[in-house]
């Protein structure tokens, strides 16, 4: 990344891979692939993966701790603009998260919209970020489209120390992005998955209460209750 503007990874492209690579380099094909792995900057960073917590200011003396290419990273000949992220309840145990995407370039292209879920506070230890879903869409120059994600119990549930799956008391945050490392539009959710829009203050939108029979609610730790 310090020596070139772009790097084309063809992986195992098959018998016609040479033609595909040539068409991409010549601009006849507009790529939109995203990395399914994280590429470390140095071997000392291994293991490195997208949902691993990296403490603030935890850099090496002569090297940043950020990976060379993070999970979900990718380039395109087109550019895209993200609108506001919206969340609403659709039914008793289904959440709809949507964002408007616009092609701001003069070329038709595909965009991979990625939704990441973060737990700000939870009753059990959670990864700092989890991929909640992704959509690949094709947009003409100037075209815009609303992209929606549906999140249910399966996407939002916790696993407790006994291996049970359920909805716990927690604070959520959603990111809609074109690639994993940056942060674009966000929505926050609070205890019982109370959805809020991130403004100058926390504005309550609705409270998510699962209706599925047998769904339990994890109790927060003692330290959380004392606060």
What are the functions of these language-model segments?
Residues 123-159:
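Intrinsically disordered, low-complexity Pro/Gly/Ser/Thr-rich segments with frequent PxxP/GP/PP motifs
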Residues 91, 141, 168-169:
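Surface-exposed loops/turns
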Residues 152-176:
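Terminal connector regions
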Residues 108-115, 127, 159-161:
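Short, hydrophobic/aromatic beta-strand segments
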Residues 175-189:
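Short, charge-rich patches within N-terminal targeting peptides
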């Amino acid at each position: 990344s310090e020596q070139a503007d772009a790097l084309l990874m063809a992986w195992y492209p098959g018998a016609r891979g040479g033609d595909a690579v040539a068409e991409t380099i010549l601009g006849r094909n507009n790529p939109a692939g995203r990395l399914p792995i994280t590429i470390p900057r140095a071997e000392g960073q291994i293991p490195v993966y997208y949902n691993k917590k990296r403490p603030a200011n935890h850099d090496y003396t002569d090297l940043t701790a950020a990976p060379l290419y993070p999970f979900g990273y990718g380039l395109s000949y087109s550019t895209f603009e993200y609108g506001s992220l919206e969340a609403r309840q659709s039914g008793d145990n289904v959440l709809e998260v949507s964002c408007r995407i616009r092609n701001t370039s003069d070329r038709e292209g595909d965009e991979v919209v990625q939704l990441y879920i973060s737990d700000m506070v939870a009753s059990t230890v959670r990864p700092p970020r989890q991929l909640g879903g992704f959509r690949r869409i094709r947009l003409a120059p100037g075209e815009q489209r609303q992209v929606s994600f549906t999140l249910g119990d399966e996407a939002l549930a916790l696993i407790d120390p006994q291996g049970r799956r359920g909805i716990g008391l927690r604070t959520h945050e959603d990111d809609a992005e074109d690639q994993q490392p940056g942060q674009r539009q966000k929505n926050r959710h609070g205890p019982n998955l109370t959805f809020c829009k991130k403004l100058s203050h926390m504005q309550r939108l609705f409270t998510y209460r699962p209706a599925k029979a047998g769904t339990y609610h994890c109790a927060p730790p003692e330290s959380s209750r004392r606060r």
